[in-house]
C-alpha cells in the first residue's frame, strides 16, 4: 500500500522541505497551474510529472 500523501501531483512531505533557491523563503503550491510559488522572489517554479523544477531560469515571473 502506498503511504504517500499528495497535494495535486506533488508529495506534501517534499513541499514541507523545499524553499525558494533565491530567497530561501517558503513556497506555496498552486495546483491549478502546477507551480511552486515564491511570493518573496515573485517567481513560480514549474512542477513537471510531480518533480519541482527549482531553477530560476525555468521559473515564471509573477507580475501584478
UniProtKB/Swiss-Prot annotation:
Q: Which GO terms describe its cellular component?
A: cytosol
Which HAMAP family does this chain map to? UPF0434
Family, as annotated:
Belongs to the UPF0434 family.
Query: Which Pfam families does the entry mention?
Result: Trm112p (PF03966)
What's this protein's name? UPF0434 protein BOV_A0835
Amino acid at each position: 500500500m502506498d503511504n504517500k500523501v499528495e497535494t495535486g501531483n506533488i508529495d506534501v512531505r517534499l513541499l514541507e522541505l523545499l524553499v525558494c533557491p533565491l530567497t530561501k523563503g517558503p513556497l506555496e503550491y498552486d495546483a491549478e497551474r502546477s507551480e511552486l510559488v515564491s511570493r518573496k522572489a515573485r517567481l513560480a517554479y514549474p512542477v513537471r510529472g510531480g518533480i519541482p523544477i527549482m531553477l530560476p531560469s525555468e521559473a515564471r515571473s509573477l507580475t501584478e
